[in-house]
Amino acid sequence: MADRDSGSEQGGAALGSGGSLGHPGSGSGSGGGGGGGGGGGGSGGGGGGAPGGLQHETQELASKRVDIQNKRFYLDVKQNAKGRFLKIAEVGAGGNKSRLTLSMSVAVEFRDYLGDFIEHYAQLGPSQPPDLAQAQDEPRRALKSEFLVRENRKYYMDLKENQRGRFLRIRQTVNRGPGLGSTQGQTIALPAQGLIEFRDALAKLIDDYGVEEEPAELPEGTSLTVDNKRFFFDVGSNKYGVFMRVSEVKPTYRNSITVPYKVWAKFGHTFCKYSEEMKKIQEKQREKRAACEQLHQQQQQQQEETAAATLLLQGEEEGEED
């Protein structure tokens, strides 16, 4: 279900194809190599695994398989010296494979985003078939887009539609750093009909193997409505600390920013500063308008007095002539 344009990647750099995602024990590509896949999602026999004994340092903890249409998806929880992580492998009808790698904290956020996509998909109307055959090859804008950025990895999520139906395209890119080659990328496409089943399988693995931490005590979220927009303020936490996600939502548009807790005070101070400055500017504008109105009234009054004096003088002159 490959598609060409991406709402979440507009303006982004071009991406390479294939490529391994640097966890020990992963295969060297999306083809028939190596020892990275877990459970049923393991790749074919033969080479491509990590050299030496490095592969044995990665332990597989659990694996789930989800069948959607003519595709198989494998979700494997693994663990190595760096911690636990999740590998997602897509195997198409022709045996082609694509893999994504997520830390467990990113997997939690990814699960939450899947919930948003599921809700959005449920609200969409029926798919509209192309009127012309050539329309099948024309790129269509994303129905909904989101993205995650974590360290050197970016995850782009686009709910899209083509002649085969609607699907969620997920692209992961890994920036190897300057001098280490171009950005590498891997992409999977989830048919929209299977999003709930996939999300539930992912949620089960997170519940069973996610890092167990005491839930942080955080303030409840709030929202406010301005004209036809609504702003949501949601406080969350992850391994990087506490943050606030500020979302701007319109009927056909949604955008959000994430503000770390350590800069909340600065953000608040900046908003207050500009609020006070705008009050002063608006007050000056009101005073200026009031002064202009007062001057206009004075000029009008002077004109009226001048006109009255002129009429009076004309009357006196006419009386003297009589």
Curated annotation (Swiss-Prot):
PUR repeat I repeats lie at residues 60-125. GO terms for cellular component: chromosome, telomeric region; cytoplasm; dendrite; glutamatergic synapse; neuronal cell body; nucleus; postsynapse. GO terms for biological process: dendritic transport of messenger ribonucleoprotein complex; DNA replication initiation; epithelial cell proliferation; lymphocyte proliferation; negative regulation of transcription by RNA polymerase II; nervous system development; positive regulation of cell population proliferation; regulation of transcription by RNA polymerase II. PUR repeat III repeats lie at residues 215-281. Residues 1-55, 295-322 are annotated as: Disordered. This is a probable transcription activator that specifically binds the purine-rich single strand of the PUR element located upstream of the MYC gene. May play a role in the initiation of DNA replication and in recombination. Homodimer, heterodimer with PURB and heterotrimer with PURB and YBX1/Y-box protein 1. Interacts with FMR1; this interaction occurs in association with polyribosome. It is linked to Neurodevelopmental disorder with neonatal respiratory insufficiency, hypotonia, and feeding difficulties: An autosomal dominant disorder characterized by severe neonatal hypotonia, respiratory and feeding difficulties, encephalopathy, and severe developmental delay. Additional common features may include seizures, exaggerated startle reflex, abnormal movements, and dysmorphic facial features. Belongs to the PUR DNA-binding protein family. Its main location: nucleus. The modification Phosphoserine is found at residue 182. It comes from Homo sapiens. The keyword Transcription applies. InterPro entries: PUR-bd_fam. PUR repeat II repeats lie at residues 142-213. Keywords: Acetylation, Activator, Disease variant, DNA-binding, Intellectual disability, Nucleus, Phosphoprotein, Repeat, Transcription, Transcription regulation. This is Transcriptional activator protein Pur-alpha. Residues 9-52 have a biased composition (Gly residues).
